[in-house]
Amino acid sequence: MTSIAFCNAFTVNPFLAAARRSPPPLTPLTSVALSPARKPRILAIFHPRTFPSFRVQAIAEDEWESEKKTLKGVVGSVALAEDEKTGADLVVSDLKKKLIDQLFGTDRGLKATSETRAEVNELITQLEAKNPNPAPTEALSLLNGKWILAYTSFVGLFPLLGAESLQQLLKVDEISQTIDSEGFTVQNSVRFVGPFSSTSVTTNAKFEVRSPKRVQIKFEEGIIGTPQLTDSIVIPDKVEFFGQNIDLSPFKGVISSLQDTASSVAKTISSQPPIKFPISNSNAQSWLLTTYLDDELRISRADGGSVFVLILESSPLLT
């Protein structure tokens, strides 16, 4: 009994027993033996549920090619639109540069030749055709700010710009238009400068939107600014008179006295309030049509088709 118990404690290894069995008889190559499928034993080291499951969906090749073509078409359309936008911006930028070059030396159009006027009108027409804001009154914020007049075909301004008798005393230094879209106000201003003073004439107006491009302007008052006198007179140390140099240094005491007097007079006059007067005649209204507008350039047309080219005060186009 003791020997039997001892043997039962160490059972025979089944793998060794299988290895000791005689091999099965060889099957001839000319015959095929079919045996029933046996279910293989699998040694499970990990639980099968710990492995994630994946699903693979098969797509027909034609369908995949169609999707690739669609995606390629969308990407191509976006790239083409970006290229077209970049190209259009370059064209507009080039047109503006050419326009500014043509305006150089024309004194706001006063000294422009007929050939220059024709070229300017052609460039203006091309810019109007590429207006990035075809409805300017719907983008009133772009109208805000001080706009400097660079060119006009309005003949009513030419006598003011070209009067020789006036230029001997005063010269037109700047013509501007300031727009406040929140208050619906327009201020037109002409600034004059002279040898010893400067002044300005201003008109204040209200405007109403009448169409996507047109506004109606009603002038309310005019203002004549108080002259700002130069408070110092600069006298050179010497001057040449009929080929002789005259020393002015002995007169510095007299000159200093004159400068003090001029400074006192200038402060007195400059401290006076401007002169205001109402505008109520039949010519107190006009309309303005904006045919081109971006963040630095504005082209407008007024009664009779007169054209105005204005540049925003902060624009590098003025430099």
From Swiss-Prot:
InterPro entries xrefs: PAP, PAP/fibrillin_dom
GO cellular component: chromoplast
Subcellular location: Plastid, Chromoplast
Transit peptide: 1-55
Domain of life: Eukaryota
A Pfam family matched in the record: PAP_fibrillin
Keywords assigned: Chromoplast, Plastid, Transit peptide
Coiled coil: none
Family named by the database record: Belongs to the PAP/fibrillin family.
Biological function: May be involved in carotenoid sequestration within chromoplasts.
Protein name, entry field: Chromoplast-specific carotenoid-associated protein C2, chromoplastic
